[in-house]
Amino acid sequence: MTEQVRVAITGGSGRMGRTLIESAKLSSNIYLGAAVERAGSTLIGVDAGELAGVGAMNVAITDSLDNAVDDFDILIDFTSPEASVVHTDWCSRNGKAIVIGTTGFNHAQKEQIAAYAENTPIVMAPNMSVGVNLMWRLLELAAEVMGDYTDIEIIEGHHRHKKDAPSGTALKMGEVIAEVLGRDLEKCAVYGREGITEERSRETIGFSTIRAGDLVGEHTAMFADIGERLEITHKASSRMTFANGAMRAAFWLGDQGPGLYDMQQVLGLKD
């Protein structure tokens, strides 16, 4: 097994990027080889550790992966769907693995990334949290036992800056439940309700979205019957939980061949 892996972090100056840098410094099996920011940023040349508030790490922020091609083996990417596709293409052409925590991909972008996985080791997950990945397993059980006779609603909340809605985690929750029940999420999902609506169909899965303040991430799946309801909830209080999960994924990916993996495999929750 690999003892230590060298990583690069894209979007190094963002909220998640700085948290990833901090997590890398605290991880004994991770070595930060590079941190990348967009061209023209005033932070180019700044020490990544000092930027993240964890002390100097002797890694200067650079504006191109090409400048750091010899400094890392695995890229950790929490940027935007468009940027993540570009970064995955770069990794595919340069013999690098990649951990993708970006959300908001459309179907075509997901297919592009899957194609790159034919020659590139990729971990792609809408949520790197251990607790969230365990929640998905609990949702499978709840859907098996209660899904056919309850009304299912998914409620999620994030900070005011989050751009995609519903969150990737919420959509994954819906996908997990729909798969167990033999439903097509694209056909049974209901995104918000307004005005006078018809009586709720039990075949649907509802989604509600909250964007407010500095919420890190809260997700609830509700299985509601007459007289009782089951709620399965995960609340994140710090981005560090996602960053630590990304480091765990990067370390695991260091021993894997080409393929498209997810956090369930990283955590040993499925083959």
From Swiss-Prot:
It is found in: Cytoplasm. Keywords: Amino-acid biosynthesis, Cytoplasm, Diaminopimelate biosynthesis, Lysine biosynthesis, NAD, NADP, Oxidoreductase. Coiled coil: none annotated. Its EC number is 1.17.1.8. CDD domains: DHDPR_N (cd02274). Pathway: Amino-acid biosynthesis; L-lysine biosynthesis via DAP pathway; (S)-tetrahydrodipicolinate from L-aspartate: step 4/4. Belongs to the DapB family. This is 4-hydroxy-tetrahydrodipicolinate reductase. It comes from Shewanella loihica (strain ATCC BAA-1088 / PV-4). The lineage of its organism: Bacteria, Pseudomonadati, Pseudomonadota, Gammaproteobacteria, Alteromonadales. The gene is dapB.
